């Protein structure tokens, strides 16, 4: 960085969003067309407890793709992750205390950005 600054270059440094360590499983049921992400689901036949998720029933209002007429999005928050009832205990043990992408968290919503300008 020192050599770059000596030449008068400005540096813009950024990175991808982060991950979230998950440790709380939430049961969700979806059909065969439901995506496999552990922190968000999109589908037309989702079954879940609406008090445990952030749900979006009108994706177009939020700029999200509308995969079919009745698409619903649900997002995990905090340290939650989604698990299906079949083999529930296996998946809970397998994914508990792992780092996952997706969902609603500071790590997922904020993208770090810094601009370094050399002193004159």
Predicted regions and their residues:
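Feature captures the catalytic ectodomains and active-site-proximal regions of enzymes
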Residues: 1-120
């Amino acid at each position: 960085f020192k050599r770059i600054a000596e030449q008068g270059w400005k540096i813009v440094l950024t990175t991808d969003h982060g991950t979230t360590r998950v440790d709380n499983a939430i049961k969700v049921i979806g059909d065969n067309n439901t995506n496999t992400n552990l922190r968000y689901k999109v589908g037309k036949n989702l079954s879940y407890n609406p008090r445990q998720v952030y749900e979006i029933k009108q994706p177009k209002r939020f700029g999200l793709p509308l995969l079919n007429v009745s698409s619903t999005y649900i997002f995990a928050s905090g340290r939650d992750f989604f698990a299906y009832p079949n083999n529930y205990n296996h998946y809970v043990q397998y994914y508990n205390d792992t780092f996952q992408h997706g969902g609603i968290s500071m790590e997922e919503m904020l993208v770090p950005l810094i601009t370094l300008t050399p002193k004159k």
